[in-house]
Amino acid sequence: METLAPPVVAVVVAHTPGPWFEETLASLHTQDYAELSVLVLDVASTEDLTARVAAVLPTAYVRHLDENRGFGAAVNEVMAMVDGADYYLVCHDDVALFPDTVHLLVEEAFRSNAGIVSPKVVSWADPERLVHVGMTVDKGGSVVDRVQPNEIDHGQHDAVRDVFVAPGGCTLVRADLFAELGGYDTAVVAMGEDLDLCWRAQVVGARIIVAPDARVRHLEELAGGARALDPALLASTGEEAAAHPVTLQELQRRHELLAVFKCYGRFHLIRVVPQVLVMAIGE
């Protein structure tokens, strides 16, 4: 049956995922959106993920990447691999979508003429607890959540609204916008990819929104500290993990500052940089 729904490709970046991965795949399999294809990028996993993917989502495509150069670099592969998609649904390997998530994101993208759409992100273990409902940023580039830690969802954040950052985990991105931006900045190997992409998208005039009716559970294995950062990523940035074990917070702040210097205009930088330096000294 022919449909007018725009084609969406879900791009799942997986690196040695744990037992939760099957639930991630199953949640994509049960989507009520007809024009959804799934591409799993197996990024230097210790074991081939093909069999695990096929057992749950046999229609998915699997692409193996031998080197882990970061989340953004992996997602960028989609631009050379996929033709005809109107949207990319960029996913971590530890998210679980509700059955109507994709169609609600696409509907709101059309209704609001948005380039990037974020769902309401809730706790993996307790979906009544909010994790993210879009994010904002201060003048120094630091990302600020719009919800409190362990805040209970009573519908208080259920209005569609513009946000500065669509937090990583599960993000709908218009394919032509992604191509115009050149994808993710591969210098941002981990932590801060979402801020960088969204800030650059706004520089070219794109709208970023949160659509809270669409919901996603997120385990947040890396950000929560349950999964270690791949040492290969540190090596790619020139860091020596043994000599200086860089923290996720340090990486996040480094990439926030990178976004500031890339995205602010010259005159705004002259005003903001001294304030950022003072804040850095205070920290």
Regions found by a protein language model. Give the residues of each.
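Active-site-adjacent helix/loop segment of glycosyltransferases
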Residues: V204-E283
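A conserved acidic beta->alpha catalytic loop
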Residues: A34, D42-T50
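A short, conserved alpha-helix in the catalytic core of glycosyltransferases
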Residues: F164-L222
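Glycine-rich, basic loop-to-helix element that forms the pyrophosphate-binding segment
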Residues: L65-D83, D93
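Conserved donor NDP-sugar-binding/catalytic core segment of glycosyltransferases
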Residues: F98-D138, S142
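A recurrent flexible, glycine/aromatic-enriched loop bordering the glycosyltransferase active site
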Residues: S142, N150-V173, L195-D196, E240-H244
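Short, acidic, metal-binding catalytic loop of nucleotide-sugar glycosyltransferases
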Residues: A26-E35
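Short aromatic/hydrophobic "clamp" motif used to bind/position activated sugar donors
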Residues: Y88
